Amino acid sequence: MADRPNIILITSDQHRGDCFGFEGRAVKTPHLDLMAKGGTRFSNCITPSVFCQPARASILTGQLPSTHGVADNGINLDPAAGEAGFAGTLARAGYDTGVFGKAHFSTRATYQPTDTPECKTGSQSYPDDWNGPYMGFSHVELIVHGHLSKARANPIPPEGQQYERYLASRLADGGAYDMWATELPPSTGAAQTWHSGLPVKWHSSTWIGDRTIDWLRGRKKDTPFCTWVSFADPHHAFDCPEPWSRRHAPEAVDLPQHRPMDHARRPRWVRTAVGAEPIVADPAIREPGWPGQR
């Protein structure tokens, strides 16, 4: 199997590349430290986009946003481009391929319904036993609402995919979402940061890890595999459950160096994009919690 190695790609969302124990920071990541020591670290990786969908499409296809066409959130990746990416290429070479967690190759909140499994309306047409294929992956178990929000209604199946159905099935009448939104004392004083009352065993990170392990244990051992384990955190809202939410005392965290905006050395379009106020004709778009907001 040396010429056809097994591959596990692990990603986290909106996570500083140096915020690990193995990078010398004062954070406790012993399991990640072991994996970094025995695996491959992408220490010199620079994302081609600060936005989620373009960056994920680039990981899958190996192309820049200007080539694969996903220039911003809200633009779906062409399925043909997705199929030509690393997952489809390996699948055609005889690999078992899977993705677990947040794929975000397609848009959840759309003005018009689409037929993608990640669309809030399109996902409702997929049966409960659907597990792919999708964008070159032969097996998928997805989180459609990667980040829950108190500012909008939470997904109730049939909207969503595997994780949404799992979480909704824990308690009747949306009880699991109520537990997630429960703030345990003491309050942080920040709107999107709290000690969540959701049991850690129901959290999306636990679910992603467990589903990946079950898939690896249940597959044929004589076939090489490639799986993308895509954790949706630590992206805000910072809603970690106990005991993990109290693992680090705030005063013990070594903050990164603050880097002020240096627009003078940046291209004009960067200065315009960062410093200008967008022209919005529809006042509803300015309302907090509008689905299209980043």
Mark where each language-model region is.
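Formylglycine-dependent sulfatase
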Residues: 1-294
